């Protein structure tokens, strides 16, 4: 009975040894942040100051070579090879070197106990007992993997995966026969016989003949110095990404590297036009995962500005704010077919000076639809839409729906928001655009997987902690119908444009800040959202680089890269809640609206109670013989007089000035007392 109890206690002791070994083993592995494809982004050194990237499984042919070299009878012994042990003792007794008597299990015990340099008899006995515990607690395959992950290979490298990456620049599974032999040759003398040493080559050639004489050994090409911090981790560091234990990020390092190369190539070409920096963000809208985050063209560069993550730097966002203004307008009764008078207006602003908003090209286009206005990124109609929505209402939309936190008081922006003065960082702006492929909802951004806590300073700055509704889906569909229309915007962007990509159903919006300091494009499909910023870290102006010609060039390449990747599944965005309505049947003009719309009610909400649509009060015209100035009413037929003389009746008549000078134009309603008076000037032609 006593012997049975002793044996049971012995087994329990061995089991406890195995349990302790599991903890020791985990403590010897590096804390690693992986990308979404299990590529290491950042590897922290362990308690021994070694870089230890673990493998879960070993390639079968590598396992065979490892066992041939280190422990041919590994599958058959219980931690100790008695034949090798007796042979080693005999050799010591006769004064010869003991040779390699340790099994793989014993070597693993030595690594776990940290007794590699202290080869006393007591330690060897302790390692032997520990080996029995390991064999009892773990399977043979588990022990082999643990050994492969704890061997030291020189240069702070622990484990064959770390050694393979550092010496050959590839994971172990991708190494060839010669590279694997070179790694195995490092064992026993890791500091003097690693692959960067010539002694490794000499030994490896002999070892290959010993282990696999039929194979041809070719001296492998080694890398220079390997970094255990991928360049894609630069942006994660700036976000404060940390993991107490090994974790997985949402980042795709391979995609990030390709995008960074696109950005670097663009800057190399466009440096002459003043563009030295840029940033790109790629999101999965359905999961709100950050797939790629590029805030520098070269984070390893010492050039000023390259150490700044520009994806997190707030800059004026230009016209990229417009879809959100129109979204609120549609929610308050406007429609893509609503008319607005694109002309000069005067607005008082906080500075005390009047604001006379102009379009990008300096022209006014008269009466246009909101569809035309958004497609062509017209400023004045956007401002009129914001005026209709109301500044307090739009501030509330930004605050309450998007949880946006401006860097200045809204009172400092006012109607300047419609002209692109609002500052925002690219990551936040791209996140906000995800409401369109998400059909009106927003969710917290994610850069870490598997319920790891997201970094505290991950934009937006506050309060998006769960899925929230930003807008009704029907209004989202109306905005998308405009943003996805590539034909209506031809006037501003042309038929051949960087905004044209290899996908079908996608939306896009450009932006250019005042005096060309910032170039923006944000666009999306149902599968991803891509935001691009181009500018300079010191905020100097670009040389006539617009959103389309700057950020648009990068956006075009990145979108096509994604369209031709597994990320693109051609997810279509629905239009089931909106419909094409016959706006002016006599002209066969249709536009998007809601099925129950009363067209006449929504059509004129932005029009002032004016009779004359064109010309505008104060317009200037050059005088040419036989030139005609069209007089156009908003809707009803008018009786027209110029300087007291009748020139005709109807919704549109022509007036031919006879000389330069001032002209008073009167439009009199035919069926009421309403009339409108404007003045224009006809000036001599410029020479």
Model-derived features: positions:
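Active-site SXXK
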Residues: 64-67, 71, 259, 288, ...
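N-terminal type II signal-anchor transmembrane helix
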Residues: 1-36
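Conserved catalytic neighborhood of penicillin-recognizing serine enzymes
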Residues: 91-118, 226-239, 334-394, 442, ...
């Amino acid at each position: 009975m006593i012997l049975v109890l002793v044996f049971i206690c012995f087994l329990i002791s061995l089991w406890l040894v195995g349990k302790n070994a599991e903890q020791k083993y985990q403590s010897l592995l590096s804390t690693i942040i992986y990308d979404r494809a299990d590529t290491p982004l950042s590897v922290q050194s362990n308690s021994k100051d070694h870089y230890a990237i673990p493998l879960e499984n070993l390639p079968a042919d590598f396992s065979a070579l490892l066992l041939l070299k280190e422990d041919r009878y590994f599958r058959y012994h219980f931690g100790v090879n008695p034949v090798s042990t007796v042979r080693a003792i005999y050799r010591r007794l006769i004064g010869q070197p003991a040779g390699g008597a340790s099994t793989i299990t014993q070597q693993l015990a030595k690594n776990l106990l940290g007794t590699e340099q202290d080869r006393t008899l007591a330690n060897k006995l302790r390692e032997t007992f520990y080996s029995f515990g390991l064999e009892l607690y773990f399977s043979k395959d588990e022990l082999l993997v643990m050994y492969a992950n704890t061997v030291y290979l020189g240069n702070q490298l622990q484990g064959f995966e770390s050694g393979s990456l550092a010496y050959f620049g590839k994971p172990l599974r991708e190494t060839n026969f010669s590279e694997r032999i070179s790694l195995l040759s490092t064992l026993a003398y890791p500091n003097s016989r690693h692959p960067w040493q010539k002694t490794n080559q000499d030994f490896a050639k002999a070892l290959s003949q010993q282990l696999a004489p039929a194979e041809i050994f070719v001296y492998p090409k080694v890398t220079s110095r390997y970094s255990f911090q991928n360049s894609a981790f630069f942006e994660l560091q700036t976000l404060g990404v940390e993991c107490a234990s090994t974790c997985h990020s949402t980042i795709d390092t391979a995609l990030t590297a390709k995008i960074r190369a696109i950005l670097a190539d663009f800057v190399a070409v466009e440096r002459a036009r003043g563009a030295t920096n840029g940033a790109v963000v790629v999101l999965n809208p359905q999961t709100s995962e950050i797939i790629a985050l590029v805030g520098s063209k070269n984070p390893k560069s010492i050039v000023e500005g390259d150490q700044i993550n520009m994806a997190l730097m707030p800059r004026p966002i230009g016209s990229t704010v417009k879809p959100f203004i129109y979204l609120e307008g549609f929610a308050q009764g406007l429609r893509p077919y609503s008319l607005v008078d694109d002309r000069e207006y005067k607005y008082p602003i906080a500075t005390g000076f009047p604001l006379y908003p102009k379009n990008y090209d300096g022209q006014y286009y008269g009466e246009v639809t909101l569809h035309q206005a958004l497609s062509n990124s017209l400023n004045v109609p956007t401002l009129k839409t914001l005026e209709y929505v109301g500044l307090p209402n739009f501030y509330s939309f930004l605050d309450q729906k998007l949880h946006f936190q401006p860097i200045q008081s809204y009172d400092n922006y006012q109607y300047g928001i419609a002209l692109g003065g609002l500052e925002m960082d690219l990551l936040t702006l791209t996140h906000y655009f995800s409401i369109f492929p998400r059909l009106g909802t927003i969710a917290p951004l994610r850069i870490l997987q598997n319920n790891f806590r997201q970094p505290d300073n991950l934009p937006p700055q506050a309060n998006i902690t769960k899925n929230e509704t930003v807008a009704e889906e029907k209004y989202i569909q109306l905005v998308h119908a405009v943003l996805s229309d590539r034909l209506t915007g031809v006037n501003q962007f042309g038929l051949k444009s960087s905004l044209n990509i290899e996908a079908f159903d996608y939306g896009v919006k450009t932006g250019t800040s005042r005096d060309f300091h910032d170039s923006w494009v944000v666009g999306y499909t149902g599968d991803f959202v891509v935001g691009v910023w181009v500018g300079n870290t010191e905020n100097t102006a670009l040389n006539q680089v617009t959103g389309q010609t700057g950020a648009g060039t990068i956006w075009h390449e990145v979108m096509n890269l994604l369209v031709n990747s597994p990320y693109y599944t051609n997810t279509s965005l629905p239009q089931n809640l909106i419909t094409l309505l016959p706006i002016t049947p006599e002209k066969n003009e249709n536009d998007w609206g809601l099925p129950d719309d009363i067209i006449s009610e929504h059509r004129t909400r932005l029009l002032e109670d004016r009779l004359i649509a064109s010309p505008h009060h104060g317009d200037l015209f050059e005088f040419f013989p036989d030139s005609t100035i069209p007089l156009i009413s908003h809707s009803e037929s008018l009786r027209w007089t110029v300087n007291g003389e009748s020139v005709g009746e109807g919704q549109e008549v022509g007036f031919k000035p006879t000389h330069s000078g001032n002209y008073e134009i009167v439009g009199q309603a035919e069926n009421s007392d309403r009339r409108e008076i404007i003045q224009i000037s006809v000036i001599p032609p410029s020479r």
